[in-house]
């Protein structure tokens, strides 16, 4: 259940957001479901962009360090009235640009164009 809620949080983080530079916590609302009941909860996620520079020459032996916006996460439980089963959801405690950790994050390259914040 935690994985499903985390995926929903991360998907909603990018939906309808404008450009944001720097890494910082932001408040969002998400829908959670338990016992067939749905309720909106408010949580905090990490959002923003971290500086990264692609090298002209890409070596197969030494990859450039990729930094991502991440932080310390904890989990809280929400009980929906009339349902004995609680819903666990993530809450970001702080956010910073850190080295991508392949043990808990997909650090691969994004295969498509990344939209720019610049308007020409």
Curated annotation (Swiss-Prot):
Assembly and interaction partners: Heterodimer of an alpha and a beta chain.
Pfam family, one: Cys_knot
One Gene Ontology CC term in the entry: extracellular space
Keywords attached to this entry: Disulfide bond, Glycoprotein, Hormone, Secreted, Signal
Family to which the UniProt record says this protein belongs: Belongs to the glycoprotein hormones subunit beta family.
Single Gene Ontology MF annotation: hormone activity
Domain of life of the native organism: Eukaryota
Stretch forming the signal peptide: 1-18
SMART domains (alphabetical): GHB (SM00068)
Database matches in SUPFAM superfamilies: Cystine-knot cytokines
GO biological process terms on file: G protein-coupled receptor signaling pathway; ovulation
Protein name: Gonadotropin subunit beta-1
Location(s), subcellular: Secreted
Sugar attachment sites: 27
Species of the source: Morone saxatilis
PROSITE patterns registered for this protein in UniProt: GLYCO_HORMONE_BETA_2
S-S bridge residues: 23-69, 35-83, 46-95, 50-97, 100-107
Described function: Involved in gametogenesis and steroidogenesis.
UniProt xrefs under InterPro entries: Cystine-knot_cytokine (IPR029034), Glyco_hormone_CN (IPR006208), Gonadotropin_bsu (IPR001545), Gonadotropin_bsu_CS (IPR018245)
């Amino acid at each position: 259940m935690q994985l499903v809620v985390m995926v929903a949080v991360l998907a909603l983080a990018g939906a309808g957001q404008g450009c944001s530079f720097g890494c910082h916590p932001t408040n969002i609302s998400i829908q959670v479901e338990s016992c067939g009941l749905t309720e909106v909860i408010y949580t905090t996620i990490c959002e923003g962009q971290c500086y990264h520079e692609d090298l002209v020459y890409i070596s197969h032996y030494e990859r450039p360090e990729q930094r991502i916006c991440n932080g310390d996460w904890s989990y809280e439980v929400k009980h929906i009235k009339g349902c004995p089963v609680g819903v666990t959801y993530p809450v970001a405690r702080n956010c910073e640009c850190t080295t991508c950790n392949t043990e808990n994050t997909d650090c691969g390259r994004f295969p498509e164009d990344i939209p720019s914040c610049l308007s020409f």
